[in-house]
């Protein structure tokens, strides 16, 4: 009986843990300073809204305005597929590929804004919104 309860408890905990990202390489800047990845496995869809994560890995260590060093950033994009709008939340990390420690005092969240046509974000928007069907 105790083993059944333990297995049930572990199963419930695993159910509510966030899924581990599976990063797919989607591009590199012309100067190879930035490398872009998207987590296509964990895209969520709610009506007209699609939420997806994008990771940027930097070729060289970067420095925030507050003097903290980081190697990567993960952005959570929420797209309004009907209105062609996006909202972005960004977190920076001390190691490559979103590893190390997340910088505690470095959170950014944008207002809703238009997705500009012909930009890399426009391509990202199109691919992410395709998950609605």
Predicted regions and their residues:
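Hydrophobic h-region of N-terminal signal peptides that target proteins for export
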Residues: 11-19
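Short, low-complexity interaction segments enriched in Ser/Thr/Pro/Gly
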Residues: 1-2, 17
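Sec-dependent signal peptide recognition
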Residues: 3-9
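Intrinsically disordered, low-complexity segments enriched in polar/charged small residues
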Residues: 9-10, 59
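N-terminal secretory-pathway/extracellular module detecting exported/lumenal segments
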Residues: 19-74, 78-133
